[in-house]
Amino acid sequence: MAKANKTAAIQFIRGVDEPVVPDIKLTRSSDGRTGRALFVFDQPEIMAPETWAGITGMFMLDEEGELVTREVNARFVNGQPSALEVTYIWKSEEDFERFMRFAKRYAACNGLGYSQN
């Protein structure tokens, strides 16, 4: 796994960036104040047997600081871990704006784009 050195990174163990880039889906309430981001990491490196037990949450790091969620769930196929599903919830417009600033930095670091469906 890569050591932390990007402008924006996701970590499951502090100090170790997860190199697998997730699929991210956003949903918002009708008034736009609350919502969630669902991250799906297919075959993330953190699911290796030697690191699996060290997951305590997902940490989104950038120049402004850190966003944290503890809602991390594993998906298994035929008894083997295959993916991580992580939910980040925001409860105010300010929280959403902060998340979007992180998301834009993370996208820029990983060559990602944004599309509305």
Swiss-Prot record:
Entry keywords, A to Z: Membrane, Photosynthesis, Photosystem II, Thylakoid
The organism's place on the tree of life at top rank: Bacteria
GO BP annotations listed: photosynthesis
Subcellular location: Cellular thylakoid membrane
Main location, first listed in the record: membrane
One cellular component (GO) term of this entry: plasma membrane-derived thylakoid membrane
Topology class, membrane: Peripheral membrane protein
Disulfide bond residue pairs: none
Record's subunit section: Part of the photosystem II complex.
Name the record gives this protein: Photosystem II reaction center Psb28 protein
Species annotation: Prochlorococcus marinus (strain MIT 9303)
